[in-house]
Amino acid sequence: MVSLVKNQTVSLSKESSALSQLHFGLGWDPVKKKGLLGGLFGGNDSIDLDAGCVLMDSTGKTIDTIWFRKLESTCGAVVHSGDNLTGEGDGDDEVINVNLSRLPANVEYLAFTVNSFRGQSFNDVENAFCRVVDQTGKELARYKLTEQGSHTGIVISSLRRNNGNWDFTALGHACRGRTIDDMHSDIVSAVIR
């Protein structure tokens, strides 16, 4: 498993032979409240973050968008696990599964995002991460999200088709937006360089 830093790229095809499916997991915890009242009343509030994925061609034109209101891509290759409203518990809070062999040939980029539909900022989030797991359950890459601040969205990472291989890049691009559509221009500028 490769632990990535911001703007680092890894070839997933080199990390896993016969790569056919990917599991993109996103996890987070609400910041624990400090002080007497925080301890008396549970210590934290729920944080509703939403994972999303934008399929794009080589120019950055959107082909499809997957998020909690559209859980499956038109081609059927990308499927969202559904909305986790709290961020509670260990492990992945939301998952996007990608069947690489079913992606249309014109899909060159997949941009993975997270945003707060409720408008909660990333000042209220800790221990956020994304990870990529192959079809055998092997974790190929992990990226710890450290982008705390008043923003409501992050373009987390991208997956790029590169001469038959798949390259995964940790982006960590903070932006504003309560929905994946609100973040569209930031997504394109972060992914297409």
Curated annotation (Swiss-Prot):
CDD domains: TerD_like. Keywords: Plasmid, Tellurium resistance. It comes from the Bacteria. Pfam families: TerD. GO terms for biological process: response to tellurium ion. Not known; seems to contribute to the tellurium resistance (Ter) mechanism. Also involved in phage inhibition (Phi) and colicin resistance (PacB). Belongs to the CAPAB/TerDEXZ family. This is Tellurium resistance protein TerZ. It comes from Serratia marcescens.
